[in-house]
């Protein structure tokens, strides 16, 4: 049987090491200790070689060992391992049965871990992925080699790095290879590289064995049957619903004075606003009631959890007391055994003393017999006595050695018992320490949850207060605008009333009218016909341009598309006849529907408002004499013109009426007080009133008189109407193109993933402006909090021109069921942005 060399003495055949050089360390044996250090006996079971030791074995050769500075390869290796950059590893597909402590220990086996970030959901539950940061790139490579596809429970662990980290690892490996090649002398051959590779493999095997031992220790937890397999979908839906209620509460609990329905009715406001406020208050109260019920349920659950925790503490206390009693009984048994052994030793000593006395008596009898013998045998007796004394002394020494051996065995047994008791005490201390750590962890976890809930509540309260203040300011501004509108309408009505009361046809007509109204209208008619002809030519050119664009885009039937666009424009040009004024709610609903139709792919475009034109009265310095036909009319006669100089068609003059499509459209916005239209409700939008309704009071007076002719000056509104019409047409065309582009994008996953994407358009500007904000918003919706690392990972996959299926496989480890919907929406957004940029819809 061979034994390892002494720890503080060099083995035979190997010369002693120089001073200051540590002795070599053998695998499976502890390092040597300095002389004079008290030694504690270690059982043989502890001294057995462990396979998890990471220290490489040193091959001992029969030559003198040099100092550490004579090994430049080892020194360069240590420098390379210490100067590498820190790297981050993505760890996903973590089983729910695997505890966070197991994952931390597995990651720590591969190297020095700087940080381990396990993502938590809004409910506090650990997600199935995390990010580990290693101090050395060698640790990252070892984790990729050993932990990827490692079976933990029912899932295989996923360990990978992004493109940026992979580039860092490749650069570090190239740098390490170059530095190793420069550090080695020229006499080193490829055998050293092969030996280094063998050493790396040997270290990987040792770490792999340690990982297997660790998984065997946690096998009871990993192989435990799942108790929630049947109710898992239902529980998941319930957790998601609770998460939504937790993240988006309707209102926090703030003591406000109770507002009754009578108080609301007492406030002067419109009926629809009063109903809206009543409904909001009812919803608020219902939500408040639901929140109170949820709070009561959560309080009961917290009390049950606290009760279970106290039960566990009492159970641990009873277990601790039971172990103390067991140890006390064990110590009593040890003391009884010790007393029994003491009595046995006392009996042995008595037997020894009895034997000694018998020997003394025998010796005394021998001496008496010797004295009685004759004198001639004195010499013989002397020799015999000498021999007998020698034998006696030999027997005495033998008995002394036997007693010494017995005492040594007794001391050895005592030391063994003392070591056993020490091990028991260490185990008890370790068990108590683990229980205390578990209790402290539970307390910290509960405190962290309470802090997170309090912070979330404060955040929701702050957002709600900001929203309420904003709404209050909006209501105040709206009231001020409404008051200003009423004042303007009253002022305009008063001014118009004073103007019409003071107007005299004979005196004031020369200031505002000149020439023949018929000739003026004929000239206006010719100008309108020329403008219509120009408009027709421009319309034909625009239609031809749209047709050429559709052909360039590869539209299957451009003529049908042009016909459809013309029908749509014709339908919009037709006037809408309103039999009665619509209520405010109907107008708001129509406005909301129109805004929803105008939002393609989450882009809002504000509709362009047509300019509201007011009638302009321009005085004339000099005018010719009024014709005889106009002299017969009175100022209050309702004729073909209004007193303000605006032409009003009459049923008795059909030759002067123009066709509907060639009549100039003039937008007239008049502000009247409440006295002119008492039955009409206040509206947010200004409505165009017919001219007859403004001047209907003149039709009641002198209706039998002959209508008089007046000299009129046409109103010149400039190019504003044309620009507004052109802007509206451009907006409509853009909206149609966006709608047709969205319809062309496939919705099914196979066709969508097979769609050819123009990667040359996908650049960093498009990623930062459109894609990244959308991805960040969706990640917050799915996970419950912002995760910049995951957003960077998805953006890097897109910028690397990865296929959508590969991105879906990677993201499925994190988002589970929502991954497919997320990737489909993201890919549709990519296709839309590239196609829109290609045809010039967006810049």
Curated annotation (Swiss-Prot):
Sumoylated. InterPro entries: Nucleotide-bd_a/b_plait_sf, PWI_dom, PWI_dom_sf, RBD_domain_sf, RBM25, RBM25_RRM, RRM_dom. Residues 87-164 form the RRM domain. Residues 1-30, 171-202, 219-243, 280-442, 498-688 are annotated as: Disordered. Changing residue 828 to A: Reduced DNA/RNA binding. The modification Phosphoserine is found at residues 226, 229, 583, 677, 683, 703. Pfam families: PWI, RRM_1. This is RNA-binding protein 25. It comes from Homo sapiens (Human).
């Amino acid at each position: 049987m061979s034994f390892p060399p002494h720890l503080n003495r060099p083995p035979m055949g190997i010369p002693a090491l120089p001073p200051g050089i540590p002795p070599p360390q053998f695998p499976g044996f502890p390092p040597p200790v300095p002389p004079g250090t008290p030694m504690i006996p270690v059982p043989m079971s502890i001294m057995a070689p462990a396979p998890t030791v990471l220290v490489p074995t040193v091959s001992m050769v029969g030559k003198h060992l040099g100092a550490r500075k004579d090994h430049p390869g080892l020194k360069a290796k240590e420098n390379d391992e210490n100067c590498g950059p820190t790297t981050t590893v993505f760890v996903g597909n973590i089983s729910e049965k695997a505890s966070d402590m197991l994952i931390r220990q597995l990651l720590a086996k591969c190297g020095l871990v700087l940080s381990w970030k396990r993502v938590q959901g809004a409910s506090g539950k650990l997600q199935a992925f995390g990010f580990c940061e290693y101090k050395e790139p060698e640790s990252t490579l070892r984790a990729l080699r050993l932990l990827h596809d490692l079976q933990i429970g029912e899932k295989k662990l996923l360990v990978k790095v992004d493109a940026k980290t992979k580039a860092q690892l490749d650069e570090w490996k190239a740098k390490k290879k170059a530095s190793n090649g420069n550090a080695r002398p020229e006499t080193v051959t490829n055998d050293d590289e092969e030996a280094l590779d063998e050493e790396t493999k040997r270290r990987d095997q040792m770490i792999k064995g340690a990982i297997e031992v660790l998984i065997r220790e946690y096998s009871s937890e990993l192989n435990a049957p799942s108790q929630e397999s049947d109710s898992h979908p239902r529980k998941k839906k319930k957790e998601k619903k609770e998460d939504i209620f937790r993240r988006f509460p309707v209102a926090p609990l703030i003591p406000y004075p109770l507002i009754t329905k009578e108080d609301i009715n007492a406030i002067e406001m419109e009926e629809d606003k009063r109903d809206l406020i009543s409904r909001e208050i009812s919803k608020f109260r219902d939500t408040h009631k639901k929140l109170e019920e949820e709070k009561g349920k959560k309080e009961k659950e917290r009390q049950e959890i606290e009760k279970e925790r106290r039960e566990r503490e009492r159970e641990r206390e009873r277990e601790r007391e039971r172990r103390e009693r067991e140890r006390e009984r064990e110590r009593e048994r040890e003391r009884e055994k010790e007393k029994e052994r003491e009595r046995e030793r006392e009996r042995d000593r008595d037997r020894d003393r009895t034997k000694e006395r018998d020997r003394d008596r025998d010796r005394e009898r021998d001496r008496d017999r010797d004295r009685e013998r004759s004198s001639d045998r004195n010499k013989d007796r002397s020799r015999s006595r000498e021999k007998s004394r020698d034998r006696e002394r030999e027997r005495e020494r033998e008995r002394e050695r036997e007693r010494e051996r017995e005492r040594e065995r007794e001391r050895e047994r005592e030391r063994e018992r003392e070591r056993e008791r020490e091990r028991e005490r260490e185990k008890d201390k370790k068990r108590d320490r683990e229980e205390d750590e578990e209790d402290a962890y539970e307390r910290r976890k509960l405190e962290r949850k309470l802090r997170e809930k309090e912070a979330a509540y404060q955040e929701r309260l702050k957002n709600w207060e900001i929203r309420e203040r904003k709404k209050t300011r909006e209501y105040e501004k709206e009231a001020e605008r409404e008051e200003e509108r009423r004042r303007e309408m009253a002022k305009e009505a008063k001014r118009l009333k004073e103007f019409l009361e003071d107007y005299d046809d004979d005196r004031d007509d020369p200031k505002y009218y000149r020439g023949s109204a018929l000739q003026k209208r004929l000239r206006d008619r010719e100008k309108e016909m020329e403008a219509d002809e120009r408009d027709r030519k421009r319309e034909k050119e625009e239609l031809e341009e749209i047709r050429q664009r559709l052909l360039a885009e590869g539209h299957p039937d451009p003529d049908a598309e042009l016909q459809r666009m013309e029908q749509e424009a014709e339908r919009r040009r037709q006037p809408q006849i309103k039999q009665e004024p619509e209520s405010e709610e109907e107008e708001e609903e129509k406005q909301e529907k129109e805004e929803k139709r105008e939002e393609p792919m989450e882009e809002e475009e504000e509709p362009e408002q047509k300019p509201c034109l007011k009638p302009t009265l321009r005085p004339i310095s000099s005018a010719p004499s009024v014709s005889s036909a106009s002299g017969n009319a009175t100022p209050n006669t309702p004729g073909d013109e209004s007193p303000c100089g605006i032409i009003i068609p009459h049923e008795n003059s059909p030759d002067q009426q123009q066709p509907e499509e060639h009549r100039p459209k003039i937008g007239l916005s008049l502000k009247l007080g409440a006295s002119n239209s008492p039955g009409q409700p206040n509206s947010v939008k200004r409505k165009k009133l017919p001219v007859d309704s403004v001047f209907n009071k003149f039709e009641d007076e002198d209706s039998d008189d002959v209508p008089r002719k007046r000299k009129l000056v046409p109103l010149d509104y400039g190019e504003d109407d044309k620009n507004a019409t052109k802007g509206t047409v451009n907006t409509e065309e853009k909206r149609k193109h966006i709608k047709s582009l969205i319809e062309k994008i496939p919705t099914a996953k196979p066709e969508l993933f097979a769609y050819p994407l123009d990667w040359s358009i996908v650049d960093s500007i498009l990623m930062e402006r459109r894609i990244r904000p959308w991805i960040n918003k969706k990640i917050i919706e799915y996970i419950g909090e912002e995760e910049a690392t995951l957003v960077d990972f998805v953006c890097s996959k897109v910028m690397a021109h990865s296929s959508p299926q590969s991105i879906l496989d990677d993201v499925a480890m994190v988002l589970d069921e929502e991954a497919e919907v997320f990737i489909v929406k993201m890919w549709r957004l990519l296709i839309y942005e590239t196609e829109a940029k290609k045809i010039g819809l967006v810049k």
